Amino acid sequence: MADLNAIVDQLSSLTVLEAAELVKQLESKWGVSAAAVAVAAGPAAAAAPVEEKTEFTVVLANAGANKINVIKEIRAITGLGLKEAKDLVEGAPKNVKEGVNKDDAKKIKDQLTAAGATVDIK
């Protein structure tokens, strides 16, 4: 260990020019280069897993021919009054429910489709 400490002390006492000359001599003696080695890029990071959507919006696209049944279903689903439900149905496309889970969105779509409406889930 004493030899290593002596080498460290000698290297520490070198000037910048002497250290540069030492590097050149070591490169030629060992057949290496002190240039930074370019690190090859690793494989591309795996694409982030696609998060499954947890909140859905049920959109009434078209009320269809049976508006009265669709209005009744809209009232049952949303709790809106008769006028508000009628305005929603006649103003299609409109959001019926927002921020519902997948099962509820599917159930609402099935109810409205059974009443004659065209429904989208977004």
Swiss-Prot record:
Q: Which PANTHER family match?
A: 39S RIBOSOMAL PROTEIN L12 (PTHR45987), LARGE RIBOSOMAL SUBUNIT PROTEIN BL12M (PTHR45987:SF4)
Q: In the record, what terms sit under GO molecular function?
A: mRNA binding; structural constituent of ribosome
Subunit structure comment from the entry: Homodimer. Part of the ribosomal stalk of the 50S ribosomal subunit. Forms a multimeric L10(L12)X complex, where L10 forms an elongated spine to which 2 to 4 L12 dimers bind in a sequential fashion. Binds GTP-bound translation factors.
Identify its protein family. Belongs to the bacterial ribosomal protein bL12 family.
Protein name, as recorded: Large ribosomal subunit protein bL12
Q: Where is the signal peptide?
A: none
Q: What is the lineage of its organism?
A: Bacteria, Pseudomonadati, Myxococcota, Myxococcia, Myxococcales
Keyword annotations for this protein, in alphabetical order, are: Ribonucleoprotein, Ribosomal protein
Recorded coiled-coil stretches: none
Q: What does this protein do?
A: Forms part of the ribosomal stalk which helps the ribosome interact with GTP-bound translation factors. Is thus essential for accurate translation.
Spell out the Pfam families in the cross-references: Ribosomal_L12 (PF00542), Ribosomal_L12_N (PF16320)
* CDD domains hit by this protein: Ribosomal_L7_L12 (cd00387)
Biological process terms from the Gene Ontology for this record are: translation
Gene Ontology cellular-component annotations? cytosolic large ribosomal subunit
Which species is this record about? Myxococcus xanthus (strain DK1622)
